[in-house]
Amino acid sequence: MKTLVVLLGPTGVGKTELSLSLAEALGCPILNCDSRQLFSDLKIGTAAPTDDQLKRVKHYFVGTLALDDYYSAAQYETDALRCIATEFQQRDTLLLSGGSMMYIDAVCQGIDDIPTISDEVRTSVKQRLANEGLEALTLELKRLDPDYYAEVDKKNTRRVVHALEVCLMSGGTYTALRKRQPKQRDFRILKIGLNRPREELFQRINARVDDMMQHGLLDEVRRLLPHREANALNTVGYKELFRVLDGEWPLEMAVERIKKNTRVYAKKQLTWFQHDTTIRWFHPDEQQHILDYVRENVA
């Protein structure tokens, strides 16, 4: 049976290098499942695969969207499944790698009946965001869908806006639409989770932020100033440095805040993944054990 190997884990854990080794061993391309790496021009701040890595193994869904493009987990589900179907005509195994929780769920179990948002609703919500601010939209979401309000990151503009749009468009709750029965896939799914001891993970995150700064993250953010209102830039690493360029924060403070916010995001990812009992967990250094496990289960 065709098998989709899903390599997941928190940001900074070491998915990229292991995904390359796995893809080479399996002789397959990589489907990126990091929602921010889909956007072009966010190479440094999202730790997107380098040009050399992209040459080493074929990737899908890296740098394919413009910053102002609207994109959702439901659209990713459609695009990824189309790509998977095409690739499975040529091979029996594929690798999907990333840490975007909702995008992984979209491919593995589907997002049922999420309505297409009309231009009227999208424009209305966008205008309210500009006029009233995120807090007003968050309170509206609390009224319409208190369950999702309780779990959503209240500072994540994209998720609050999308959930509110769905509520307004469907007349129901985003929670109900997300929690319907999983869709059945015509391929097997093998989930591999990567994790490290908490202190080790946090040290890697801190070091990676320092490395991003040394490789020009501030210059990347400066180039993106004309697009700063794009949802894609409401992302750790970018929003903090915009405040530096605005003269609100010193650089040292912003760098420390990026590290802290990245660590918080990693904890949220792990909390989400821990609810999935189908994940087999490994330390990233256990590369041979991971490869053996995959080969045993895709044979």
Which sequence ranges carry the predicted segments?
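Phosphate/pyrophosphate-binding catalytic cores of soluble transferases and nucleic-acid-acting enzymes
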Residues: 1-299
